[in-house]
Regions:
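Conserved Radical SAM active-site core
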Residues: 2-143, 149-151, 339, 343, ...
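Conserved AdoMet/S-adenosylmethionine-binding subsite of the radical SAM
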Residues: 68-257
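Intrinsic structural disorder
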Residues: 1-3, 7-16, 26, 33-36, ...
Length: 357
């Protein structure tokens, strides 16, 4: 019997800059085993032992928050306000173990019962018929992750995922069934692969989110192994916080080029280039169906792009969203962390232009 995943539903620590951070993960651990996965590669934050969410407990939280009006903690306050959920923030909801446990299926059943909006992130290329019976384009959207187009390139970085052509075919099927669909091109490593992917998929998607490769500063073994695979990449990685990243000039040039080759809206997942996005959230949640309207707008990206600080933000204590060493003494609310992150990112809490500092 699998261990129970104790914390399957909670806003992530990315909420200061992300409006689609109320994540649900039905599994802890992922069989797709992508070499670049931040969840597996960052030290200390993601255990590798397999665990399954207690879906009955999640159902209880939904009932208490939505039917009984319980807003006693951050997750229940978000549920009560129908903040859209991002399913698959750390592990794929449709990996192989779903055939045995059906935790994602049961979670989507809850979503359908409460007509609750869920954005599904996945690398899958197929769903059994039982899923189509509960999925609803009004409340369910899909973000498919694909890093490139050619089989050899994909297999260099991903050993157990469907090929890009299979995932693109799945995107086409989703569009034909009426779903909002995006492709998250992450990580960007070789631009020629990005261009091939866009040309093969742009007729089937509503949005692209793009984000460049990041390597963990605190995991030398992973860095060494992945750097050996980066043949043909003409850029210098620079240290920024906990990660090595592409330099900002290269990232900006890449984004400008991507925008020049497609008419599909682009969202920029790199934290330093959020404002180059074609929408107010890098994953495009503001372009999803109206059921998603209550996304968490009080974040640094939204404020930077609109100047609007009047949007609702949860009042419950949010410190459970962080590891202990990231909690700031005296802070309890999301808005406090957002305001601090905004000032740190842009230098002045009242600076509202779209200039990149």
């Amino acid at each position: 019997m699998a261990k129970t995943y104790a914390n399957p539903l909670l806003p992530t620590s990315q909420f200061p800059m992300c409006g689609n951070c109320f994540r649900a993960d039905m599994y802890k651990g992922c069989a797709f085993g992508c070499d670049y996965c931040f969840a597996n590669n960052r030290g200390g934050n993601f255990e590798r032992d397999f665990q399954v969410a207690n879906v009955d407990l999640i159902r209880k939280w939904f009932k208490e928050a939505i039917e009984d009006g319980d807003v006693s903690n951050i997750k229940k306050e978000c549920l009560n306000n129908r903040v859209p959920i991002h399913l698959g923030g750390l592990s794929d909801p449709f990996q192989k173990c779903e055939e045995k446990y059906r935790a994602s299926y049961r979670f989507l059943e809850i979503s359908k019962y409460y007509k609750y909006p869920v954005n599904i992130s996945t690398k899958t290329a197929h769903l059994d018929d039982m899923y189509w019976e509960i999925l609803d384009p009004k409340i369910h959207t899909f973000s498919l992750s694909i890093l490139g187009y050619s089989d050899e390139y994909v297999r260099t970085w991903e050993s157990a995922t469907p090929l890009a052509t299979e995932r693109i075919a799945f995107a086409k099927e989703l569009k034909e069934r009426g779903f909002w669909v995006s492709i998250r091109i992450q990580p960007i490593i070789l631009m020629e692969e990005v261009e091939k992917l866009i040309k093969a998929s742009e007729n089937y998607v509503d949005y692209y989110t793009v984000e460049h490769l990041k390597l963990p500063v605190d995991n030398a073994d992973v860095c060494k192994r992945l750097l050996q695979k980066m043949y043909g990449v003409q850029t210098q990685l620079v240290a920024k916080g906990r990660e090595y990243e592409f330099d900002s000039v290269t990232k900006r040039k890449n984004i400008e080029y991507i925008k020049s080759i497609t008419n599909v809206k682009i969202g920029c997942g790199d934290n330093d280039l959020h404002v180059l996005s074609d929408s107010l959230n890098c994953c495009g949640i503001d372009t999803m169906p109206k059921a998603f309207k209550n996304w968490l707008k009080y974040n640094s990206m939204y404020i930077k792009m609109t100047g609007d600080r009047t949007q609702w933000s949860p009042s419950a204590n949010c410190n459970s969203c962080f590891n202990g060493d990231c909690v700031i003494k005296g802070f309890t609310t999301m808005s406090q962390y957002v305001d601090k992150a905004y000032a740190a990112q842009y230098g002045d809490p009242n600076q509202l232009t779209l200039d990149l500092l």
